[in-house]
């Protein structure tokens, strides 16, 4: 009886660990999001050449978040981070109408990779504070998310600088990764 209670207690209260890969085109806001989640503040960023990795603690979950640079020359390196990824965060600059097709192409190219077949997808429609930003429904359409029949996905409107929407996204991610486990 005591052992059963101990097992139940540890299952309920043990810290869960999740490996998250955060990608998107350059200047979408990935690094700003990472450090807003990690430190709760805005940091001055420069274009990421390579990656940043941080552990973000949230609601008894330890997210290891890999923020990988999005410049076109280094996107082929994304695949080196796919292994063991449970959740994929794809960050989109909602204000960048010129490159939303490029973002869609990169997203679908990635989702076709075998190593990511079981990863859940969270799209952060970032920069919602800008006046000409596309809303989540428009980005869903432009990214072709409804065509992802075999993939569990969700889109969350965000503003990295204020933190708006970030934790709602993490809630969805943690619930959906936990449900797959």
From Swiss-Prot:
Subcellular location: Golgi apparatus
GO terms, biological process: intracellular protein transport; vesicle-mediated transport
SUPFAM superfamilies named among the record's database cross-references: P-loop containing nucleoside triphosphate hydrolases
A GO cellular-component term linked to this record: Golgi apparatus
PROSITE patterns in UniProt: ARF (PS51417)
CDD domains named among the record's database cross-references: Arf1_5_like
Lipid-anchored residues (N-myristoyl glycine): 2
Keywords: ER-Golgi transport, Golgi apparatus, GTP-binding, Lipoprotein, Myristate, Nucleotide-binding, Protein transport, Transport
Predominant localisation class: Golgi
Binding-site residues for GTP, renumbered to this chain: 24-31, 67-71, 126-129
GO molecular function: GTP binding; GTPase activity
Pfam families per UniProt: Arf
Similarity comment text for this entry: Belongs to the small GTPase superfamily. Arf family.
NCBIfam families: small_GTP (TIGR00231)
Function: GTP-binding protein involved in protein trafficking; may modulate vesicle budding and uncoating within the Golgi apparatus.
Protein name, as recorded: ADP-ribosylation factor 2
Taxonomic classification: Eukaryota, Viridiplantae, Streptophyta, Embryophyta, Tracheophyta
């Amino acid at each position: 009886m005591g052992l059963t209670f101990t097992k139940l207690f540890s299952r309920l209260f043990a810290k869960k660990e999740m490996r998250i890969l955060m990608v998107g085109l350059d200047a979408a806001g990935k690094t700003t999001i990472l450090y807003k989640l990690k430190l709760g503040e805005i940091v001055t960023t420069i274009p990421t050449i390579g990656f940043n990795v941080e552990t973000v603690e949230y609601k008894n979950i330890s997210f290891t978040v890999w923020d990988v640079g999005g410049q076109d020359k280094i996107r082929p390196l994304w695949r080196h981070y796919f292994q063991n990824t449970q959740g994929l965060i794809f960050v989109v600059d909602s204000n960048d109408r010129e490159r939303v097709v490029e973002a869609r192409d990169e997203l679908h190219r990635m989702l076709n990779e075998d190593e990511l077949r079981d990863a859940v997808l969270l799209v952060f429609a970032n920069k919602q504070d800008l006046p000409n930003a596309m809303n989540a429904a428009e980005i869903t359409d432009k990214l072709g998310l409804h065509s992802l029949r075999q993939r569990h996905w969700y889109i969350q409107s965000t503003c990295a600088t204020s933190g708006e929407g970030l934790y709602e996204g993490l809630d969805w991610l943690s619930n959906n990764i936990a449900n797959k486990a």
